[in-house]
């Protein structure tokens, strides 16, 4: 699970 400060990322 990876999310960045701008809220765009990947959820696994």
From Swiss-Prot:
Disulfide bonds: none annotated. It is found in: Membrane. The keyword Nucleotidyltransferase does not apply. Signal peptide: none annotated. GO terms for biological process: bioluminescence; phototransduction; visual perception. Transmembrane segments: none annotated. Its main location: membrane. GO terms for molecular function: G protein-coupled receptor activity; photoreceptor activity. GO terms for cellular component: membrane. Keywords: Chromophore, G-protein coupled receptor, Luminescence, Membrane, Photoprotein, Photoreceptor protein, Receptor, Retinal protein, Sensory transduction, Transducer, Transmembrane, Vision. It is a multi-pass membrane protein. Each Drosophila eye is composed of 800 facets or ommatidia. Each ommatidium contains 8 photoreceptor cells (R1-R8), the R1 to R6 cells are outer cells, while R7 and R8 are inner cells. Visual pigments are the light-absorbing molecules that mediate vision. They consist of an apoprotein, opsin, covalently linked to cis-retinal. Belongs to the G-protein coupled receptor 1 family. Opsin subfamily. This is Opsin Rh3. It comes from Drosophila virilis.
């Amino acid at each position: 699970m990876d999310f960045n400060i701008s809220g765009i990322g990947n959820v696994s």
